[in-house]
Amino acid sequence: MPFLGQDWRSPGWSWIKTEDGWKRCDPCSHEIRSEDNQYPVNHSIILNSGEEEIFNNDCEYAAKKRKKQHFGNDTAAHSFYREKWIYVHKESTKERHGYCTLGEAFNRLDFSSAIQDIRRFTYVVKLLQLIAKSQLTSLSGVAQKNYFNILDKIVQKVLDDHQNPRLIKDLLQDLSSTLCILVRGVGKSVLVGNINIWICRLETVLNWQEKLQNLQMTKQVNTGLTLSDLPLHMLNNILYRFSDGWDIVTLGQVTPTLYMLSEDRRLWKRLCQYHFAEKQFCRHLILSEKGHIEWKLMYFTLQKYYPTKEQYGDTLHFCRHCSILFWKDSGHPCTAADPDSCFTPVSPEHFIDLFKF
């Protein structure tokens, strides 16, 4: 049974119910006793009185040291698990001092395990890309270390499963550009850590880029159904579900049939209408020699000037009632009468803006 101590911020003590009433549980005392009782030895048989006193003192010191190590391991085990949400406060209060930083949120929201979820992968990569472009130097030393550890896991994941390599190449390109500017302009901005650390990071990113550049897609030996075996209307349906033009171009390079379907004007027209407004079409109208609108060229031209709509399988959410940022699947301890009405999806750009003070 947990009991709240004098300090309201403490985790409290653990109590167990016995025949004599409630007693405070000491987890390490049972472990130490069990270790001492495993090999009972009568030390008085082999030691005299003077040596026995020295032996007892050594045993007492060893027991205290073992007890201290046990408490240290227990504390580390408790701190290892953290809630996957964070309270976003922008000013000091009576209970909370300071404010929540981008680095603190980055450390607390468990992005390391989020990259293993295919629904969150694109979201996390986009967030890392935005941080690489403008917020890298605002992270604390611990957050920067966590950032590059997560990036290392992402690169290894792509090298292993061969999924989303183009997405990671774009991220590493932006990151290497930022690191080059920081290293060349040393002294112009405040860098956390020694300059040699940043040079080492740049070399690591360049090494990642080289590995991804040399990535060879292994041909899978599969006797089952393939894309070529599907009817045309199903292949067309697959293409219409893509929201990224580069994915359509890449898929069109697989077979001549898919290339023919990927060049369909109606497909690119629908993609342009999904991402861009009609006013934007008029400003960058591209016509063919026959007077038809080149929707494919229009898409890639408009992409240079305007942001495209982004779709994510799962995103972070912000609770307006509790001011808590959290993953929707993990939830958070909400006290609102109707929690769902207080939740707002947080885009990667909005996530960055939350911590601009």
UniProtKB/Swiss-Prot annotation:
Source domain of life is Eukaryota
Q: Where in the cell is it found?
A: Nucleus
Name the UniProt key words of this record, in alphabetical order: Nucleus, Ubl conjugation pathway
Chief location of this protein within or outside the cell: nucleus
User: What are the boundaries of the region Interaction with beta-actin?
Assistant: 1-83
Q: Which cellular components does GO assign to this protein?
A: cytoplasm; nucleus; SCF ubiquitin ligase complex
The reply to whether RNA-binding figures as a keyword in the UniProt entry is no
Q: Does the keyword Nucleus apply?
A: yes
Q: Which residues does UniProt call coiled coil?
A: none
Q: In which pathway does it act?
A: Protein modification; protein ubiquitination
Q: What's an example GO BP annotation here?
A: protein ubiquitination
CDD domains named among the record's database cross-references = F-box_FBXO25
Q: Which InterPro entries match?
A: F-box-like_dom_sf, FBX25/32
Q: Where is the F-box domain?
A: 224-271
Alphabetized PANTHER family for the sequence: F-BOX ONLY PROTEIN 25, LD30288P
Function text: Substrate-recognition component of the SCF (SKP1-CUL1-F-box protein)-type E3 ubiquitin ligase complex. May play a role in accumulation of expanded polyglutamine (polyQ) protein huntingtin (HTT).
| Assembly and interaction partners | Part of a SCF (SKP1-cullin-F-box) protein ligase complex consisting of FBXO25, SKP1, CUL1 and RBX1. Interacts directly with SKP1 and CUL1. Interacts (via C-terminus) with actin (via N-terminus).
The free-text domain note is: The F-box is necessary for the interaction with SKP1.
Q: Could you identify this protein by its name?
A: F-box only protein 25
Output the lineage of the source organism: Eukaryota, Metazoa, Chordata, Craniata, Vertebrata
Name the encoding gene, please. Fbxo25
